[in-house]
Amino acid sequence: MVDIRPFRAIRYTAKAGELENLITQPYDKITPQMQWEYYARSPYNYCRVILPTEKNRYEAAQQRVRNWLLEGILAKDEAAAVYVYTQAFTVNGETYTRTGVVAACRLYDFSENTVFPHEVTYNMPKQDRLNMMRAVKKNLEPISFMYSDPEGKTRRVLSEAASAAPIITVQDSFGVKHTVLQVADMNVVSSLQKIMQDKTLVITDGHHRYESALKYRDEMRASTNWTWDSAFNFHMSYLVSCQEPGLVVLPTHRLLRRVTLTTEHLSRLHMFFNILPLEPSVSAIEAYLAANRGRNAFAVYTRGKAYGLTLKSHAQIAPLHTSNTSEETRKLDVVILRDVIFNHVLNTGVLNLDEDILYERWTKDAVNRVDSGDANVAFLLNPIGPETVWRIAQKHERLPEKSTDFYPKTASGLLIMDISPEEKL
């Protein structure tokens, strides 16, 4: 059973200035360059909360939120509501619209078979977000989930609220238009609650924050007089149907910083893959991946050289898979890349985030980072479909870290949820 509740969102007021100068990408998508650009836009830019530059960043975030509330830069809505959130965007020349609901969603242990992860997580980001939650006592960014609704029940309910005037309309620096409607009508809220109560959820973005929220919830239960309505039992969540036409998944390309691709590596790769030399350009790499969608194919780029790889035989690599997962999972590109190329051919061992491995969404950014010397070699992939992610998660299986990139991310700074000990939902 999925328990969702309306909540009183904390939002920027007009006193803060133009919203386009305040909102940001999620904290883990903000590069150092973006961080400084966000800081320059406004003294109230949300990056100053989710990714402060100070050494005592958790305390700095806590003080900013407190001061901004006192100064009227931020204010809590008078009435509890759910929020209909629509994003209009273009990717690879195609235009999409994605609509979901932002609500407080009860936190469930994974053993309860209500919420399913689909990726392995890193420990460091989980500790970072837990420290932030302890300091600020707010959900600063939503966790994103998908659920199955083939009959379109939620879309029909949401259409009833579509006539309301939006409380937020803003376009971000990436060209994504964000629109938020406030739904305080308890009849509509009740209809959504009834639809969601028999659903299960798959995390699409925010695995680290979800696991941090579970730990924070348990800490608060151990140290406060809590009830099932205590806000820290919930997390601000963005819920979208996996049948939503605008549910777009992009690949996450892998860049290795300490491994150099040698002729010996290429020889060993040839044991398992057909290798085709490619023109070392973004367009040639993207054309190769597009032409080989539906096959197990990779592009490899290393300063001035590029190759296309297609798998010769699944039977040949079967002994190299280390995890006890289903055949469907073992046949995914990200799993083959990890088990065969990284673990067997390159013998990379444990890859530490930032030190050993980097991730990029766009081909051009991956190529540029190799050309700049920030990484030695890039492995570029095709995306995984949302239906595949759904099936694998329901089997209690996890993909390698950063296997998917549900695009676009929800904007940070639109809505905040209070999870102070005294807050009830």
Where is each model-derived feature located?
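Surface-exposed, charge/polar-rich loops and edge strands
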Residues: 1-425
